From Swiss-Prot:
Source organism: Acinetobacter baylyi (strain ATCC 33305 / BD413 / ADP1)
Lineage: Bacteria, Pseudomonadati, Pseudomonadota, Gammaproteobacteria, Moraxellales
Protein name listed in UniProt: Nucleotide-binding protein ACIAD3137
Keyword Nucleotide-binding: yes
Chain's role: Nucleotide-binding protein.
Cysteines paired by S-S bonds: none
Pfam families linked to this entry: DUF520
InterPro entries on file: DUF520 (IPR007551), UPF0234-like_C (IPR035571), UPF0234_N (IPR035570), YajQ-like_sf (IPR036183)
GO cellular component: cytosol
Keywords: Nucleotide-binding
CDD domains linked to this entry: YajQ_like
Length: 162
C-alpha cells in the first residue's frame, strides 16, 4: 500500500553556509565597519546568536540572515527569533532553529488531515507522521492540502513507497 512520511528536518550544513555567508556580508558592509557585530551558529543547541551594538543593527543582521536562508532554499519558518536583550554595550538576540515535529504540531497536522475529508490513514510515529492509502493520487492530494496550510514550521515529504 502506498505511503509517505511527513517530517520537519533542517539541513544544518545549509544553515551553517547561510550563517557563514551572513558573516562574510557583515565584514564587507560599510555600515558595519568598526562595529562589534557577530553572528554564530551553535549546532548542538540548534541556536544562532546575533551580537551587535544596537537594536537597529540586530534587525539588519537578522534581515541579512533571512535573505541568505531564502538564497539557500531553507524555509524561514524554521527560525524562531527570541526577544533581543541588552547586555552591557551589546544587544544579543538568540534565534532558535525549529527542527523535528513536536507532538502538538503532529497532532494538529493529523487533525487537519482527518478534517480535510480526504480518506487516508495517518498515524504519528515519533517525530514523523505516516500517511497511507490505496491510491497514490489520494496521497498527492494530502501533500497539496498540507502545502496550503500554515503550521508554523517547514514540512517535507519523504520515504514515498508504493
Amino acid at each position: 500500500m502506498p505511503s509517505f512520511d511527513i517530517v520537519s528536518e533542517l539541513e544544518l550544513f545549509e544553515v551553517n553556509h547561510a550563517v557563514q555567508n551572513t558573516q562574510k556580508e557583515i565584514q564587507t558592509r560599510f555600515d558595519f565597519r568598526g562595529q562589534d557585530v557577530s553572528i554564530e551558529l551553535n549546532e548542538k543547541s540548534k541556536e544562532i546568536k546575533i551580537s551587535t551594538e544596537s537594536d537597529f543593527q540586530c534587525e539588519q543582521v537578522y534581515s541579512m540572515l533571512e535573505n541568505h536562508f531564502y538564497k539557500r532554499k531553507i524555509d524561514v519558518q524554521a527560525l524562531d527569533p527570541q526577544k533581543a536583550t541588552a547586555s552591557g554595550k551589546n544587544v544579543v538576540q538568540v534565534i532558535k532553529l525549529k527542527d523535528g515535529l513536536d507532538s502538538d504540531t503532529a497532532k494538529k497536522i493529523n487533525k487537519a488531515i482527518k478534517e480535510s475529508g480526504i480518506k487516508v490513514q495517518s498515524s504519528i510515529q515519533g517525530d514523523k507522521i505516516r500517511v497511507t492509502d490505496k491510491k497514490r493520487d489520494t496521497l498527492q492530494q494530502v501533500m497539496t492540502f498540507l502545502r496550503e496550510q500554515q503550521f508554523g514550521l517547514p514540512l517535507q515529504f519523504n520515504n514515498f513507497k508504493d
